[in-house]
């Protein structure tokens, strides 16, 4: 069966892995997934990720992060979905938990956090929110 929302699948794998207290989770690889993981790593929500070979296909092993036994990611949600795309200008980017969380945005300059997008004065598709 074809995957209609690869990014939603990635976020669900991370959410489920943290609920199950896993050290790492596997996900099929794509450029978009890797860029989103770059943002999560820069912002300190995951320890890191590496590319692996999974039965002839490339995959990503995501190292999950915990703080005092609690997952670093308390909430992760897809904002722009295949059936309803959500776009925002740089001045209208949503703040998650009054700035405590991040919004992941796909911009012409790449996948950025909301703070980076505001700093570079670019808007784009609001992919997900994390805190």
Swiss-Prot record:
Keyword match RNA-binding: yes
An annotated GO cellular component: ribosome
Alphabetized Gene3D superfamilies for the sequence: 3.30.1370.30, 3.30.1490.10
Keywords associated with the record: Ribonucleoprotein, Ribosomal protein, RNA-binding, rRNA-binding
Molecular function in Gene Ontology: rRNA binding; structural constituent of ribosome
Record GO biological process: translation
InterPro entries registered for this protein in UniProt: Ribosomal_uS8, Ribosomal_uS8_CS, Ribosomal_uS8_sf
Subunit structure: Part of the 30S ribosomal subunit. Contacts proteins S5 and S12.
Function description: One of the primary rRNA binding proteins, it binds directly to 16S rRNA central domain where it helps coordinate assembly of the platform of the 30S subunit.
Family: Belongs to the universal ribosomal protein uS8 family.
Protein name: Small ribosomal subunit protein uS8
Organism phylogeny: Bacteria, Pseudomonadati, Pseudomonadota, Alphaproteobacteria, Sphingomonadales
Gene that this sequence comes from: rpsH
């Amino acid at each position: 069966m074809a995957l209609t929302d690869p990014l939603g699948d990635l976020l669900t794998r991370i959410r489920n892995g943290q609920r199950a207290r896993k050290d790492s989770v596997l996900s099929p690889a794509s450029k978009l997934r890797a860029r989103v993981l770059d943002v999560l790593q820069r912002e300190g929500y995951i320890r890191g990720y590496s590319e692996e070979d999974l039965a002839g296909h490339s995959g990503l092993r995501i190292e999950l992060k915990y703080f005092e036994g609690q997952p670093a990611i308390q909430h992760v949600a897809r904002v722009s979905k295949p059936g309803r795309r959500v776009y925002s200008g740089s001045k209208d980017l949503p703040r998650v938990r009054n700035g405590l969380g991040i919004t992941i945005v796909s911009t012409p300059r790449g996948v950025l956090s909301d703070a980076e997008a505001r700093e570079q004065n670019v808007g784009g598709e609001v992919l997900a929110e994390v805190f």
